[in-house]
């Protein structure tokens, strides 16, 4: 575990419409029921400043490098003000999206983007990576149907199936590259409770 922290850092990753936020909330409530010190947060966002940056990110069309730097600026504020202090106090921190989402959403738009994002994170941040990441694996066709059935309110929701596939296969690649950290939960045909039970087995 990173010597900057005493707690545990858990992240949830995947594309749109796959149930990440639901699973983050369910794990948070489960750990609370066990009297475990835990906080739930999200990216992009998590602090007052970062949430303001999120509004620009999800509703405005930015140039690729501008979008990446916007995400990194929001993350730095989030980590410094919320994540690191909580970890240092011994809390479990659950975060709905983190560095891997930046790789897949912003990095793919840039040449050598995967390595660029990870290297930028290591340079600007205090080398903090999740202890465990849950990739909620839902097939793109299923995910886009779920998104289309709800109120779409940001630029990522309304993109087509090709975008969903690109993001999906990026997360698949990352899970193959970092199998010790990233745990794949195949969730296309499972209920939220069944997914939650699988996640608990990895804790």
UniProtKB/Swiss-Prot annotation:
Keywords: ATP-binding, Kinase, Nucleotide biosynthesis, Nucleotide-binding, Transferase. Its EC number is 2.7.4.9. One of its GO terms (biological process) is dUDP biosynthetic process. ATP binds at residues 14-21. PROSITE patterns: THYMIDYLATE_KINASE (PS01331). InterPro entries: P-loop_NTPase, Thymidylate_kin-like_dom, Thymidylate_kin_CS, Thymidylate_kinase. Coiled coil: none annotated. It is an enzyme of class 2 (transferase). GO terms for molecular function: ATP binding; dTMP kinase activity. It catalyses: dTMP + ATP = dTDP + ADP. It holds the Pfam family Thymidylate_kin. One of its GO terms (cellular component) is cytosol. Phosphorylation of dTMP to form dTDP in both de novo and salvage pathways of dTTP synthesis. Belongs to the thymidylate kinase family. This is Thymidylate kinase. It comes from Rickettsia africae (strain ESF-5).
